[in-house]
């Protein structure tokens, strides 16, 4: 394979992995530990 193809595939895999981890952190099991500042604020 050419170098440009390998670099493109590597960057694409990193981007997909980072996006998947961000979605898992936002909506998955770790999201239970996140606090909601709007719920903490009293009107």
From Swiss-Prot:
Coiled coil: none annotated. It is found in: Plastid, Chloroplast thylakoid membrane. The chain crosses the membrane at residues 5-27. Keywords: Chloroplast, Membrane, Plastid, Thylakoid, Transmembrane, Transmembrane helix. The keyword Oxidoreductase does not apply. One of its GO terms (cellular component) is chloroplast thylakoid membrane. GO terms for biological process: photosynthesis. May play a role in photosystem I and II biogenesis. Belongs to the PsbN family. PANTHER family: PROTEIN PSBN. This is Protein PsbN. It comes from Welwitschia mirabilis (Tree tumbo). The lineage of its organism: Eukaryota, Viridiplantae, Streptophyta, Embryophyta, Tracheophyta.
């Amino acid at each position: 394979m050419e170098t440009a193809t390998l670099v493109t595939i590597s960057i694409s895999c990193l981007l997909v992995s980072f996006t998947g981890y961000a979605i898992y952190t936002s909506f998955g099991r770790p999201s239970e530990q996140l606090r909601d500042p709007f719920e903490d604020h009293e009107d």
